[in-house]
From Swiss-Prot:
Its cofactor is Cu(2+). This is AA9 family lytic polysaccharide monooxygenase G. It comes from Botryotinia fuckeliana (strain B05.10). InterPro entries: AA9, AA9_LPMO. Cu(2+) binds at H19, H103, Y192.
Length: 325
């Protein structure tokens, strides 16, 4: 990396240190390094399982861009060349570098079948079905405890389960946090989508129907245009949760109580999966070879540990001024 590029990168990191992104995953107990912002300053850029994007200031996609490709996998995202391998029914841990405590909101995970090679698929043709969600967990205090808070408490890690009955193949997993701290006014919500290629194995046969990325949300959805600083019954945005029967859980028309129950159940399941699998990456040896996917069996401990240096919760709580611009 040239000195000028290094200087630009260091300045960018200092300016947006409060925001984060998914730097790696643990898929079925194996760690894979994702796309890193620093990759954009390397020539050539190393191959990765994570989709590259031009969101180098770690900013967000606003509701005004919901009908554009930027909502799918972040700003001007391009296909990842590699894929992480995982079996249907296994868990996947998304490791965020850091997240501001003030950026409360839901955590949502989708899958889309590439029906071929995910390295060349047109992202605008991907049809996403929701496999995991968490929203408002506890509203005893304002603004409440959210899925984003649970992720922070779990060392900036969120766990989801790949459905056991879906057909094997190449998929894009779309994982995002929607920050709602400014969502009380139109175009105030902040979406932080992340996309990763998966090669899913198994004996399932189901091919769930999905929704195009540009049609997942509208700017006036009740879970998007919402004031979290007032008492509320929160509805998680997006299409219905997928399940084997084809019925939805926590749909847009679901009652608030049903939504809350679904969130608690989902979050509890995520916590128990982390404890049961005991997958961690605190001692992962990351390969330095450019273009090679990092694939290392995680050592058994009781806590997921991010490979990248983790910022403290105190640092995360400082709201970055640029995010509300």
């Amino acid at each position: 990396m040239s000195f000028s590029k290094l200087t630009a990168f260091a300045s960018m990191v200092a300016a947006v240190s409060a925001h984060g992104y998914v730097s790696g995953i643990v898929a079925g107990g194996t760690y894979y390094q994702g796309w890193l912002v620093s990759n954009a300053y390397q020539t050539p850029q190393p191959d990765s399982i994570g989709w590259a994007d031009q969101n180098l200031d770690l900013g967000f996609t606003a509701p005004s861009a919901y009908a554009t490709g930027d909502i799918i996998c972040a700003k001007e995202a391009t296909n990842a060349a590699l894929s992480a391998k995982i079996a249907a029914g296994d868990t996947i841990d998304f490791q965020w570098t850091v997240w501001p405590e003030s950026h409360h909101g839901p955590v949502i995970t989708y899958l889309a079948n590439c029906n071929g090679d995910c390295a060349t698929v047109d992202k605008t043709t991907l049809e996403f079905f929701k496999i995991d969600e968490g929203g408002l967990i506890d509203d005893a205090t304002v603004p409440g405890t959210w899925a984003s808070d649970k992720m922070i408490a779990n060392n900036n890690t969120w766990t989801a389960t790949i459905p056991s009955d879906i057909a094997p193949g190449n998929y894009v997993v779309r994982h995002e946090i929607i920050a709602l701290h400014s969502a009380g006014s139109e175009d105030g919500a902040q979406n932080y989508p992340q996309c990763i290629n998966l090669e899913i194995s198994g004996s399932g046969t189901l091919a769930p129907e999905g929704t195009l990325g540009e049609a997942l949300y509208t700017p006036t959805d009740p879970g998007i245009l919402v004031n979290i600083y007032a008492a509320l019954d929160y509805t998680i945005p997006g299409p219905a949760m997928y399940n084997a029967s084809g019925a939805g859980a926590a749909t847009g028309a679901a009652s608030a109580s049903a939504t809350s129950a679904a969130v608690v159940a989902t979050s509890a399941a995520a916590s128990s999966v982390v404890a049961a699998t005991s997958a961690a990456v605190s001692s992962v040896a990351v390969s330095s070879a450019a273009g090679a996917v990092v694939s290392t069996t995680a050592s058994p401990t009781t806590m997921i540990t991010s490979v990248a240096p983790a910022a403290t919760s105190a640092a995360a709580s400082d709201d970055d001024e640029t995010c509300d611009a």
